[in-house]
């Protein structure tokens, strides 16, 4: 089975589903908060025209997900799988934002756990690109066990390039840290990391 960039994923806390064009209004209702974007390279993404550009890029990516609360259906935010490299056995997770009321708790960990467990059924490494000055997201990556492997300029869809720190989490390290050892049911574990 090939890697699905837009899976439907569910936990007790969260429901992730492919982002649809008619999700714009509900997602912008979260994204219009300027404080969500204050450490992001594009701090104007709370503005509707700027967010429309982000949303268009998300739709064209083929990997964007809408995040909702499993119990209530409340819109929480969005994230994305992108840059799948089957030869290298890697995929990236990013473009994530969450409503502020979900910051500082277990939501980001629950989200990344769902996405990492899906990814590690197919690839050996997950990459994250984080804005160099986004200390909140960089702290979250440290807590998640991400290892810095470099820096690179990233030009988000229709935006100017900015320096991003590249983090990696390898399947073996994740499984050791979380106590998991098997690929999701019915999936090949894929190539093992040699790094």
Roles of regions detected by a PLM:
Residues 121-130:
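Conserved GNAT acetyl-CoA-binding A-motif
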Residues 66, 74-83, 92:
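Conserved beta-strand in the GNAT
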Residues 1-53, 164, 172-195:
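A short, well-structured alpha-helix characteristic of acyl/acetyltransferase catalytic modules
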Residues 134-150:
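Conserved active-site alpha-helix within GNAT-family acetyltransferase domains
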Residues 129, 147-163:
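Conserved catalytic-core motifs of GNAT/GCN5-like acyltransferases
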Residues 84-93, 103, 107, 124:
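A conserved beta-turn-beta hairpin within the catalytic core of GNAT-like acetyltransferases
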Residues 68, 94-106, 131:
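A short, internal acetyl-CoA/4′-phosphopantetheine-binding micro-motif in the GNAT/acyltransferase core
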